[in-house]
Every structure is written in C-alpha cells, then in structure tokens.
C-alpha cells in the first residue's frame, strides 16, 4: 500500500490536535507536526455545506384520518367541523400491511353500536377478527382496484368503520350520529434502493374523508341519505357511494379499474412524481360524470428526496363561481408519501386540502408480474432482473438512497434498520426516536445546544415511548401516539427505555452512535409485594448504529486527494476488551481519510484515544455513491490495556469487511461500519501473542466531514 499518510507516520512522530469549530458547531481539525523539518503541516477546516431543509413531513410507516361527527343539537349545534393537519395519526409499523392498523382498529373496536357491531372495511383488506362480526368482507363485495396493479405486498390503503350508535347527552345539549372509522395507508420495508433512472408507471387506489358542515352534501359523490357531509363525514367506503363502478359486469375498456384509482408516473432520473386521481364512473346515464367513463379530480406533482416525496395536489374539477357537489374543489400543498419494498415497487401517500374539507390517502404499485416473473401485458415495459416491476428496460440500474444499520456488540451482527430518508430520526423496533432536540435548527432536528449555550459535539439522552410510559402505569396498550405500541413484543407492565449517544453536531446528513435498550419492570412485574422503587432494570442489548442520506450518484465529485476528518466509536475484544467513543477533544478517537474520486479509491486510518499509532487502516474502492473495503490492525496488533505493562493483551484484525457511503448534496460527509467476529487466523495470533483462546473481534462505526485548507 502506497499511502503517504502511513509513510509519513513511519518517519515522524505526529501530534494530533482535534478541536471544535466555534462557529460551525464542531469541526474535525487534526494537524501533525514534523519534528524532522520546521515546515508547518497544512491546517484544515470543515467545508461549508447546505443544511437540510425543514421537513414538514417527518415520514413514517403510515397515517390515518378519523371520520368526524358534528354536534347537531338544535340551538347548540356546531356549524362545521373541519379537518386539521393535527388530525393525522401515525399508524406505526403494521403487523402485516393487509391488516387494519392496530392502533386505530383498537379505537374503533371500542365504539358502541345499536346492534350491528361489525367492522366494515375495504374489500381487499384482511377481514377483522372482531369477536362480534365478520367485518362485512366477502367474495361478492364491490371491487376497488386498478387493473393490472392489484397484488400489493408492502403498502395498503383503505377504510374501515362501524355503524356507531348515536351519542346523546341532552343535559349538555349534545347529539352526534353517523358512522365512525378511519381512512389510512401504511406500509413496511421502506425502500433503501430505487431505480437510478427511467420512468415507471404506478397505479393503485385512493380514499377520502370529508369535513362536516350544516346543510352540506356531496350528491355527485355520495347520496346523502344519512346526512353524510352534514352530520358526519362522507367517505369513499360509505354504502351510499353509488357513482363509481365497482362491478366487473359493468367494466368498460375506458375504465382504469374499479372505484377510485390513481395513475402515477415516477421519473427517477429527474426525481419527479406526477399523476392523476380519478373516479371510474358507474354509468353514463347520470349528470355526475359529464358523459365520460372516468372523472379526474386531482393532478399530483412531487419532488423525490431519498425514499420520500413531497409536493402538491391540484384540484382539476373546479370552476370559478360554480358550486360543485363534491369536496374536491381545493388544491393541497401538503402532498407527501414514500416508497416501500426493496426496490421501490410500491408507494403510499396522503394530503389534506388547503380548505380543510377533504383528506386523501392512497397506495400504488408497479405492474403486476405474471407467474414467470415478467410484467403483465399492457405494461410500459417488463422489469429487468435487479429492477422494480414495470421499469422500462434493462437499464433499470438501482441506486442506494440511504444507509441505516445496527451493529450488535455481543454477537457482532449487522442488521438493516428502517429509515425514512431522515438521518436525524432513528427507527428501532418500529419506534421513531428523534436524535436531536426539538428546538434545534433545520426542522427542529439539528444541533444540540449544550453547556453555556454552546454546541455539544455528541448528544446523550434517554427516550421512552409514550405508549410504554402509559403501559407501565396501566398495563394496557395505548393508541394514537407517534410510536409503535408493543411492536417489539409484549411491553405491558414494562417501560422500554432507549439510551442514545449520537455524533456529530457538524454532520447534517449522517448520524452514528451508541444505542442501549433497557426494560424497566413495573412493581407488579417485579413481584407482588415490591414497591415501585424496587422495580428491576434489565439491560437488554447494547449496539452501535449509523444512518445517512446518500449523495445522488450524479453529484459524486471527481476530485483527487480529498481529505475527510472525523471520529469513531469502537469496541475491540479478545477476552478482555477496549471501548472508545467519538470525540472532538484533543487526543480523542480520530478518523482521517483521503479519497481519490477520480480513481475511485479511499484510504484511511482510525486512531484510538490517547494513542499515536493508528488502530485500523482502511483501504477500499468507491462504487457509485458508496464504498467497500477492508480494515486491519497493525502487524503488532492493538494493545487492549495500555496500563498492563507486564502482559498486555492484544487484538489482531486481519480482514474486516468495511462498508460505507457518501452523504449530503455534494458528498460533504462520509461514514462507514464493520463488525468483525474473528477468524482462525486471528485466533492463532491471539493464542500465540497473548496466550488467549478466543479470536479477536471488533465493532466500529465512523463518520467524517470533508476538509478544506484554512485560508
């Protein structure tokens, strides 16, 4: 290896200085002093980089909106009840996407009825196991699907409801009546890779729920036989929605499917999503469809960032000075959604109209594949191997849009975490943990303002999901909070606490650190006679994590000899162990890399705290917007305990597989990871050098910022 940094280290005694950048929230600034020559070493500082824009939509597995019911007590009635952005409820990680969202389902299960306690739902969803009903699902139910785009695996959207009993409280002048339920979309396996280019057609279904207003009806959509739109929300699953075609016997060539369907085009090369939301009309013999087989109500336009998209929905069936008897008359500036599936095969979305009159959810997918794996006829193109179904050619190369990994310390395993293209939001066990304080920059998720108003380089905190806090008190499952209740198992009577240390305040698109899961048993769980103070705390697992928003491959630089500097977390063992945390302090854990983008090579070194010789050297090759390589210790090994002067145990790592990526708009940041469980070679070296019996092992995550010379 011809590494000038390593060659220089062999001739001179480097002194490293690592200090925080006062104005930039922490900086990696390591400078060496050559004792053989008086010339000063070059000084570096972090490059300035564009900070992430504030994200109105923080992403998630899915969202639901509940139907409204208006108080219509004479003389004390509410004139209207609008929909609000705050009405969106996170669904959490679904048990299975085809099943109803657990949180919202448990709410509706408790709704009282006058006799019919069935939960009715979209025909393609899994029937409810509700003890008193069959959920109204059956083979003869009306259809709702886009032709040729029916076999969803990762995302489902739909509706479910009960014929709720009227709420009558005459002493408080209150009467509410009408159905109670939700519309929703939710998915699993948010996409880590998407097609790098090309245009792909997605089709699916969409659903709506309206506000309530005295005297309001939507006769072009729903027959207001029970005062839908007036006393309670009109919605796409209402039994009086009679104007969309739901039956195969009346399907026409110009129909795109059954019910309310979507037709979207995703231009992955230009990161754009466009499309339309339509109704497939039931009959030409009425005045609601202008003698067409389909009626378009919205056009969608969104920008794709990572595996998420945000944009607008424009109402297309509206005219000035004309009253429409449907709710789709206002544009929306709140369209958001995301891609699900290993290659972005499916997507889900939602929006609320700007007039707060209607909320919409939907799901769409690429063309269904036939049994032989080819896309069904009529597609814009069959998928090539390695591409999403419906992609247009063999050129459907995939690109990685994010990294999110967890490395366990006890068994040295690496597993993928879910992520919604937000490095500042950790998703573990279906629970979303904000890594940065609410009052910080860039959409409430940036720097940690620490002591004396300064910026802390790393942040340490504890996070207890709201659901678990309540479960610990009541021992029952809770609903509606922005967490996934009990997704990691039965937490009733327990409080699961996550201890997190995250680095670094000068990294905007990359976050990495330490994660510890703890279960605190309640007094009842700890023992019948125990007091709350006696509740036992069990440390479940300690691990490391890294997640980052990958640079667009078209934006990867072509420069040579680009310097990145940063820090790292490490755990190294061979019987005894050494651990070190990220730091910007002088003598702390240090990382330095030289990247030759032109030749697609990366070399680097990780140096442990209070050491001069590097702990690991790393060599790798750049592939697209990421890199792979190997890490190894020096031939003399790594001293695990410097204080043991007579018999210092050592670790020998010969061939640890490193993976990583470049992050930010212009590859301003890089990071990577490796977990090395040991091998026969290191076991032999360990036994020879330190008289041990176990193979050396290591777990490491690292991150660094691009540097520029100090002017």
Swiss-Prot record:
This protein's UniProt keywords: Cell outer membrane, Lipoprotein, Membrane, Palmitate, Receptor, Signal, Virulence
Subcellular location: Cell outer membrane; Cell surface
Region of interest (Disordered), residue spans: 33-58, 79-105, 118-146, 225-251, 370-396, 437-492, 682-711
Residue stretches of biased makeup (Polar residues): 46-56, 119-146, 474-492, 684-699
Lipidation (S-diacylglycerol cysteine): 21
Covalently attached lipid (N-palmitoyl cysteine), positions: 21
A Pfam family matched in the record: TbpB_C
Gene3D superfamilies tied to this protein: 2.40.128.240, 2.40.128.250, 2.40.160.90
One GO cellular component term: cell surface
Lipid bilayer topology: Lipid-anchor
Induction profile: By iron starvation.
Compositionally biased spans, kind Low complexity: 373-393
Residue stretches of biased makeup (Basic and acidic residues): 96-105, 457-472
Leader sequence segment: 1-20
Chief location of this protein within or outside the cell: membrane
Function: Neisseria acquires iron by extracting it from serum transferrin (TF) in its human host. Acts as a TF receptor and is required for TF utilization. Involved in the initial capture of TF. Helps select only those TF molecules that can be used as an iron source and concentrates them on the cell surface, maintaining the iron-loaded status of the TF C-terminal lobe until its delivery to TbpA.
Record's subunit section: Binds only human holo-transferrin (TF), via the TF C-terminus. Forms a large complex with TbpA and TF. Interacts via its C-terminal domain with Slam1.
Other observations noted: N.meningitidis cells will only bind to human TF, not bovine or porcine TF, explaining at least in part the bacteria's inability to cause infection in non-human hosts.
Family named by the database record: Belongs to the TbpB family. Isotype II subfamily.
Swiss-Prot/TrEMBL domain comment: Has 2 lobes, each of which has an 8-strand beta barrel flanked on their N-terminus by a 4-strand handle domain. TbpB stabilizes the TF holo C-terminal lobe's conformation.
Protein name (Swiss-Prot/TrEMBL): Transferrin-binding protein B
Organism whose genome encodes this protein: Neisseria meningitidis serogroup B
């Amino acid at each position: 290896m011809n590494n000038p940094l390593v060659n220089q280290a062999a001739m001179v005694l480097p002194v490293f200085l690592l200090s925080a950048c006062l104005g930039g929230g922490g900086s990696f600034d390591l400078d060496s002093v050559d004792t053989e020559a008086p010339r000063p070493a070059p000084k570096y500082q972090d490059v300035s980089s564009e900070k992430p824009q504030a994200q109105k939509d923080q992403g998630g597995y899915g969202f639901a909106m509940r139907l409204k019911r208006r108080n219509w007590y004479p003389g004390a009635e509410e004139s209207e009840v609008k929909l609000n952005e705050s009405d969106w409820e996170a669904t959490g990680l679904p048990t299975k996407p085809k099943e109803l969202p657990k949180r919202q389902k448990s709410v509706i299960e408790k709704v009282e009825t006058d006799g019919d306690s069935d939960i009715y739902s979209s025909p393609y969803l899994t029937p409810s196991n509700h003890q008193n009903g069959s959920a109204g699902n059956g083979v003869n139910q009306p259809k709702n699907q886009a032709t040729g785009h029916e076999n969803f695996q990762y995302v489902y959207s739909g509706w479910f409801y009960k014929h709720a009993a009227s709420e009558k409280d005459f002493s408080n002048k209150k009467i509410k009546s009408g159905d109670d339920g939700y519309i929703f979309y939710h998915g699993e396996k948010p996409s880590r890779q998407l097609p790098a280019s090309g245009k792909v057609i997605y089709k699916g279904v969409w659903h709506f729920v309206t506000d309530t207003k005295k005297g309001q009806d939507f006769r072009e959509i729903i027959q207001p036989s029970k005062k839908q739109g007036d006393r309670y929300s009109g919605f796409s699953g209402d039994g009086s929605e009679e104007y969309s075609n739901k039956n195969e016997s009346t399907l026409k060539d110009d129909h795109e499917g059954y019910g309310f369907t979507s037709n979207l085009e995703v231009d992955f090369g230009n990161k754009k999503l466009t499309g339309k939301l339509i109704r497939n009309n039931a009959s030409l013999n009425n005045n609601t469809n202008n003698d067409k087989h389909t009626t378009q109500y919205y056009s969608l336009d969104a920008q794709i960032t990572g595996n998420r998209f945000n944009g607008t929905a424009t109402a297309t069936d509206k005219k000035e000075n004309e009253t429409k008897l449907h709710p789709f008359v206002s544009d929306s500036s709140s369209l958001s959604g995301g891609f699900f599936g290993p290659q972005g095969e499916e997507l889900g979305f939602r929006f609320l109209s700007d007039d707060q009159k209607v909320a919409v959810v939907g799901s769409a997918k690429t063309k269904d594949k036939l049994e032989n794996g080819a896309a069904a006829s009529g597609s814009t193109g069959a998928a090539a191997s390695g591409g999403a179904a419906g992609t247009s050619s063999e050129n459907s190369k995939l690109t990685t849009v994010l990294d999110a990994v967890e490395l366990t310390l006890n068994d040295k395993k690496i597993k993928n975490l879910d992520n919604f293209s937000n490095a500042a939001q950790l998703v573990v066990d279906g629970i979303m943990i904000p890594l940065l304080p609410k009052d910080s920059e860039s959409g409430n998720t940036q720097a940690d303002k620490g002591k004396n108003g300064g910026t802390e380089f790393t942040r340490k905190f504890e996070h207890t999901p709201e659901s678990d806090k309540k479960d610990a008190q009541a021992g029952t499952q809770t609903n509606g909070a922005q967490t996934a209740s009990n997704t990691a198992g039965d937490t009733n009577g327990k409080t699961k606490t996550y201890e997190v240390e995250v680095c670094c305040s000068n990294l905007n698109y990359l976050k990495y650190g330490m994660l510890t899961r703890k279960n605190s048993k309640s007094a009842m769980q700890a023992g019948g006679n125990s007091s709350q103070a006696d509740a036992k705390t069990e440390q479940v697992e300690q691990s490391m994590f890294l997640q980052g928003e990958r640079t667009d491959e078209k934006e990867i630089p072509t420069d040579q000899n680009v310097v990145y500097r940063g820090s790292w977390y490490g755990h190294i063992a061979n019987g005894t162990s050494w651990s070190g945390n990220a730091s910007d302090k002088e003598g702390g854990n240090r990382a330095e890399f030289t990247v030759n983008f032109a030749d697609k090579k990366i070399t680097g070194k990780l140096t442990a705290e209070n050491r001069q010789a590097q702990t690991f050297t790393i060599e790798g090759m750049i592939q697209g917007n990421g890199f792979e390589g190997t890490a190894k210790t020096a031939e003399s090994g790594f001293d695990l305990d410097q204080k043991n002067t007579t018999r210092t145990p050592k670790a020998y790592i010969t061939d640890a597989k490193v993976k990583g990526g470049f992050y930010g708009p212009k590859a301003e940041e890089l990071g990577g990871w490796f977990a090395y469980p040991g091998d026969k070679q290191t076991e032999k070296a360990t036994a020879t050098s330190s008289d041990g019996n176990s193979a050396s092992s290591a777990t490491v995550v690292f991150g660094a910022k691009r540097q520029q010379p100090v002017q």
